[in-house]
């Protein structure tokens, strides 16, 4: 059997020791490792990669002709040069620092203005947070309110329940200096502030 590993946002881990990729621990050549540059460069580049175990490369070579490669050769060569010159690693370090600051600002603001009704889940990495919110409004309503002030959120029905609505909060797209004010406004619009 084969295991497909999508190491989503592994480059953007902010705290603690990074968890090694399953593929790096694989001694049986049964893990196919997938990755993308969408979070670390920009989504429009649409360059992804796949690391195959040696035993599977031959099979892949036989069927490769059935698939159309849609990624620009010029973009691939530019990215290769970018990596070779060390610019990619430098950029990752800068992104990691910026997103870490944005994450901390988001967590602080949610704690300050959420009045115990907002809990952030999985706060160690990435470009977004999953929020669990105790509110009379459902996740779709909360996301619609967020959208009205330009904040991108997505409802997560699978982990919402009768007591909490779950949604993904994309803090990465908010300028660092605006996070506190935006979260404060959002909590007020969501009517999570204590009534006076």
Regions found by a protein language model. Name each.
Residues 1-2, 32:
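Hydrophobic "anchor" residues on beta-strands that sit immediately upstream
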Residues 9-10, 38-40, 54-57, 125-128, ...:
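Short, solvent-exposed loop/turn segments at secondary-structure junctions
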Residues 31-112, 120-121:
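PLP-dependent aminotransferase class I/II
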Residues 52, 130-135, 153-190:
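Conserved PLP-binding active-site segment of the aspartate aminotransferase-like
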Residues 9-40:
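Active-site pre-lysine segment of PLP-dependent enzymes
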Residues 97-107, 118-132, 144, 163:
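Conserved glycine-rich beta-strand-loop-beta hairpin in the small C-terminal domain of fold type I
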Residues 2-4, 62, 79, 106-109, ...:
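A generic "structured core" feature
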């Amino acid at each position: 059997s084969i295991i497909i590993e999508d190491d989503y946002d592994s480059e953007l881990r902010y705290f603690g020791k990074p968890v090694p990729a399953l593929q790096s621990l694989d001694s049986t050549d049964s893990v196919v490792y997938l990755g993308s540059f969408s979070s670390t460069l920009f989504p429009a580049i649409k360059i992804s990669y796949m690391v195959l175990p040696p035993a599977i490369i031959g099979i892949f070579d036989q069927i490769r002709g059935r698939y159309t490669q849609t990624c620009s050769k010029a973009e691939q060569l530019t990215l290769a040069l970018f990596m070779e010159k060390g610019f990619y690693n430098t950029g990752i370090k800068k992104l990691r620092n910026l997103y870490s600051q944005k994450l901390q600002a988001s967590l602080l603001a949610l704690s300050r203005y959420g009045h115990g009704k907002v809990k952030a889940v999985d706060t160690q990495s990435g470009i977004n947070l999953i929020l669990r919110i105790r509110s009379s409004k459902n996740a779709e309503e909360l996301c619609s309110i967020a959208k009205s002030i330009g904040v991108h959120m997505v409802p997560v029905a699978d982990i919402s329940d009768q007591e909490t609505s779950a949604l993904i909060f994309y803090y990465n797209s908010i300028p660092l200096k605006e996070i506190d004010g935006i979260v404060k406004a959002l909590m007020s619009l969501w009517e999570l502030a204590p009534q006076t």
